Regions:
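N-terminal extracellular/periplasmic Venus flytrap/periplasmic-binding protein-like
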Residues: 4-14, 22, 148-239
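Glycine-rich nucleotide phosphate-binding loop and flanking beta-alpha elements
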Residues: 41, 100-102, 157, 237
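Flexible glycine-/small-residue-enriched beta->alpha junction loops
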Residues: 86-139
Length: 240
């Protein structure tokens, strides 16, 4: 996407600067910035929250910490920032998330869960896509169910954008010459139909047949087979 050439620290710092400007914040009053970040290595490593604080020219007393809970990283960061305020530990904390899947690809940080054969075997490890299809099978979500929800979601997103419901939540990403790089979500496809989605092949069927289906069924023996219902049109995308 359009953001593939923008370093993640720049994405984060642009948001912090906009937050300061829009809310007339005296950054000296901010106690902490908590940012969720999957695979906090390379350009996203070395505590990207604190790095973004420095790049944003916020007050030097503002601390920063990064959190990695995979897909829930940003939400977890917001929860932590809120908990700091609720507990009285902080008067003002900022919570959010940043990541560039184009620049720091999925799986970059490795880890024993999938790389160590003993750990993978003992934990019945399967890739996330297989897990998604497993859950759909276990809880009776058919291909029609997930495709119809995707169609509805695309239309809702487009209508919300047209109604400017996100105008106070989104800023354009601009380059060093103040020229726009991205101003609108590229992932919205309001023209999506059940027919167009029906032409897409399941993304994880071949992977499942390679052996991961058997691993999943070992863990969930109540299932006789895994129905592969997810594909690029009804799943989250790499949106940077």
């Amino acid at each position: 996407g359009s953001l593939n050439e923008v370093p993640p620290v720049q994405l984060a710092s642009k948001v912090l600067k906009a937050l300061e400007k829009r809310n007339n914040i005296n950054t000296e009053d901010v106690d902490d910035v908590v940012l969720g970040c999957v695979h906090p290595i390379g350009e996203q490593g070395a505590d990207i929250a604190r790095t973004a604080v420095l790049e944003s020219n916020w007050h030097q007393t503002v601390s920063g910490v990064q959190v990695d809970r995979f897909c829930a990283s940003g939400l977890e960061a917001v929860n932590i920032a809120a908990a700091q305020v609720m507990s009285g530990q902080s008067d003002l904390s900022v919570g959010g998330g940043v990541e560039s899947m184009s620049r720091v690809p999925l799986g970059s940080s490795g880890g024993a869960w999938m790389a160590d054969p003993t750990v993978a075997y003992n934990s019945y490890f399967v890739p996330q896509g297989i897990s998604a299809d497993l859950l759909a099978t276990k809880y009776n979500y058919s291909r029609t169910d997930v495709d119809s929800y995707a169609v509805s979601s695309q239309k809702r997103a487009s209508e919300a954008w047209k109604d400017k419901r996100f105008k106070n939540s989104i800023i354009p990403v601009k380059d060093q010459n103040n020229l726009p790089i991205l101003e609108i979500d590229e992932y919205m496809r309001p023209e999506t139909t059940m027919q167009s989605l029906g032409a897409l092949e399941p993304s994880f069927e071949k992977m499942g047949k390679s052996g991961f289906n058997d691993v999943a069924i070992l863990k969930y023996p109540e299932l006789e087979a895994i129905e592969h219902v997810h594909h690029a049109g009804n799943s989250s995308g790499i949106v940077d």
